[in-house]
Amino acid sequence: MLVAFDFLDMNAKNITLRPGRPADAAKIAAMSRDLIETGLGWSWGPDRVARSIANKDTFTLLACDRDRVVAFAIMYFGDEHAHLNLLAVRPSHQRLGIGRHMVEWLTESAYAAGIATIHLELRAANYSARTFYRSLGFTESAYIPGYYRGREMALRMMRVLRRPGTPLPAWPAPKLPKS
């Protein structure tokens, strides 16, 4: 699967989205260490990322500029709830709409899979991430003291796609041509 999008900035015109593969684990782990886990130690190392990629309930989405990985997202899909574990965009490719397209793609996939809510955590002091997720329909649901290695508070956010326990939306039957 390769998906091309029209992004907000002409510099991003060569961006494609594709699923993560086991061979991508080291690149994704390094990006997590450098862009997300700064100052916290490294919990999403290559082995953990590789296990996530191999997990049938987790989807890893990559954004590539030609052959270079410039962004990634890892999302776990449960029965009714999904959890966006990680999202990172290289600084050289931020503010081009890449992260937004990735979260929108994952949200649409979650909705199609019957997911009721998507949850995520971020550093409570990361105000730009709060603003980003709010713009995508996420709301703040809880503060978690010491979430990051006992040192930093997390903010949990969620987006409701449908009420848990309610039936899935009915898909209209396709209209077949009359013969």
Language-model segments: which ranges?
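Conserved catalytic-core motifs of GNAT/GCN5-like acyltransferases
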Residues: H119-L122, R134, T139-R156
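Conserved beta-strand edge residues that scaffold enzyme active sites
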Residues: P46, D67, A124, Y147-Y148
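Short amphipathic helical patch at the helix-1/turn junction of helix-turn-helix
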Residues: V89, R123-A124
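Conserved G/P- and acidic residue-centered "switch" motifs that form tight phosphate/ATP-binding loops
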Residues: G97-G99
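Conserved short alpha-helix immediately C-terminal to the canonical SAM/SAH-binding motif I
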Residues: M102, N126-A129
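Short acidic/polar active-site loop segments enriched in Thr and Asp
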Residues: E80, A116, T139
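Acetyl-CoA-dependent GNAT
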Residues: L2-A12, P19-Q94, V103-W105, S109, ...
